[in-house]
């Protein structure tokens, strides 16, 4: 599940199901993007336990990609550690976009704080230049979607029901806090 599924469900349930034509257009820079991108990222976590994901990547994806499956556990561990730095992107983007740090300082932060390679750091700045504050939709959106879904019940089935409802009903991000 991801933002494409989110848009398909909104179209099916709201546009076709209820005739709410205002949902046939989705402005990229809208509050819906936080939910769309957040549910896309959270959907991975909801779909697999950590062990299931590692097994799927190791047994299916790594061989398909021609990668050594023995590297999968270490890569998963690295990604878990790097995820803890995710909000550094938001902070760097904010400082850069408001002009309190220069492009060079932002690149330095991305390399030394966010731990991106230099090439990826330059790409991130291009993303900030093109998309502005959109970067928050990924990690903040994921955390808000996760917290909302998990408050709706304790079982995996209840989480999936809440997730599906979240992805197919009109919401604004502040509704995820309730």
Question: How would you label these PLM feature ranges?
Answer:
Residues 4-9, 47-51, 152:
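A generic secondary-structure signal for well-formed alpha-helical elements
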Residues 104-178:
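C-terminal, non-catalytic "cap/extension" segments appended to globular domains
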Residues 7-29:
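Post-HEXXH active-site segment of zinc metalloproteases
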Residues 30, 34, 79-86, 100-101, ...:
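Soluble non-cytosolic domains of exported or imported proteins
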Residues 37, 42-124:
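Long, amphipathic alpha-helical stalk/connector segments used for oligomerization, subunit docking
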Residues 1-12, 37-41:
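Active-site recognition of the HExxH zinc-binding catalytic motif
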Residues 24-31, 75-79, 91-97, 130-134:
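Second-shell loop/turn segments in exported
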């Amino acid at each position: 599940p991801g933002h494409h599924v989110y848009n398909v469900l909104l179209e099916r349930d709201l546009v076709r199901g209820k005739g709410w034509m205002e949902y046939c257009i989705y402005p990229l820079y809208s509050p819906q993007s936080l939910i769309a991108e957040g549910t896309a990222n959270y959907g991975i976590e909801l779909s697999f336990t950590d062990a299931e994901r590692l097994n799927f990547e190791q047994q299916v994806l790594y061989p398909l990609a021609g990668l050594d499956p023995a590297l999968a556990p270490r890569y998963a561990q690295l990604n878990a550690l790097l995820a803890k730095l995710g909000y550094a992107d938001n902070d760097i983007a904010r400082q850069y976009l408001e002009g309190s740090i220069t492009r060079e300082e932002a690149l330095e932060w991305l390399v030394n704080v966010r731990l991106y390679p230099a090439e990826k750091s330059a790409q991130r700045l291009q993303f900030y230049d093109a998309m502005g504050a959109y970067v928050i939709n990924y990690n903040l959106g994921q955390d808000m979607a996760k917290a909302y879904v998990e408050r709706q019940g304790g079982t995996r089935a209840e989480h999936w029901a809440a997730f599906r409802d979240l992805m197919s009903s009109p919401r604004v991000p502040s509704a995820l806090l309730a």
